[in-house]
Amino acid sequence: MTVDPLIQSLKGKLVVSVQAYMGEPLRTPETMAQMSRACELGGAAIRCQGLADIAAIKGRCEVPVIGLWKDGHEGVYITPTLRHARACVAAGADIVAIDATDRPRPDGKSVEDTFRPLHEEGVLLMADCATIEDIRRAVDMGFDLVSTTLSHGVAAIDCTMADGPDLPLL
């Protein structure tokens, strides 16, 4: 199996999630870009949320940018559809993170139906997973990276970490 050079460049590297939400004091694309630049100077790659942030960060940083689009707060909300993923690519994401759980997606498609066309288009994809089964399925499908982003069970419901991470999975 050949590993994409961009994916290889992340091996052993810290990836910092640079995200702020509506109503938070740092919530501007320019601030996210400045924070990302500081992370880049420290040697980290970036994971960010939202089309404006992806574009602003790509305009300021040279490290790989993992982009995603959070739509809502319940169910599958991390880059939930093909349309969301393609918009992240258009905004400049080097890698697109999508929810790779087997939960129902808002467009009624399976994760495989979302993954396949993107993979065929050459989009590098990160699988955001909740369980070891999600990880195995993502690897079998051919995702470029996997993440345990959704492993803190509550995240699938309301975006909190009240129960903490699933340490055995990690």
Task: Name every feature range the model reports, one short phrase each.
Residues 26-29, 47-66, 75-83, 100-118, ...:
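Active-site-adjacent beta->alpha loops and helix N-cap segments on the catalytic face
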Residues 35-42, 96, 117-122:
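Short, surface-exposed connector motifs at secondary-structure boundaries
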Residues 1-90, 138-140:
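Conserved N-terminal beta1-alpha1 strand-loop-helix module at the mouth
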Residues 15, 45-49, 66, 97, ...:
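Conserved beta-strand positions in the central sheet of alpha/beta enzyme cores
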Residues 89, 98-99:
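Extended substrate/RNA-proximal surfaces in nucleic-acid metabolism proteins
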Residues 61-65, 91-95, 119-122, 140-147, ...:
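Glycine-enriched alpha-helix->loop->beta-strand junction motifs that scaffold or abut catalytic
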